[in-house]
Amino acid sequence: GCLWGSTLLHNGGYPSDWLRWVASEGFMLNKYSSMAVSFKLSRKAKICTIDTVEDYHRLMRKYAKPKYENSEYSSLFKEKVIDWKKLSKDYDAFHLTERAFWEMRLPLSNILECEDGSELCDFYSYDCESWILFNLDCINWGSVINQDVKIKSLYDD
């Protein structure tokens, strides 16, 4: 298993990129707007960060697997996805930065094409900047935050 999260922001806007997405989509506002958990990772934590398209291509040279591995679709589709099991053996955590998320969410060019003719999956399904913690021992401390934030859907009047 793993733990998913989004970076706590202290910029006066939304508390996290996840809550920005929740508000923009009007997605379960009551559930996600009143409480959060904050944690700090150990300085020794091994973190795999994707901040650019080049970072993603470099990562996928070692940690890629076919999206439709052992499937009737494997010969039709050449998409590659991250091999999370393999990545989790070498890293404590994975971080997809906000910049990388937006750049590779729905790319309009061929930036995710590989030299072998395959293509890397985009990050559309991630919804926002994301952290995935594989090794919970890399958490130095954590705390519950009662947010006094009223998140309003963009669709409300």
What residue ranges belong to the model's regions?
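Extended catalytic/binding region for NAD+/ADP-ribose chemistry, centered on the ART fold
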Residues: 1-34, 38-40
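Active-site and NAD+-binding cores of ADP-ribose-processing enzymes
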Residues: 24-157
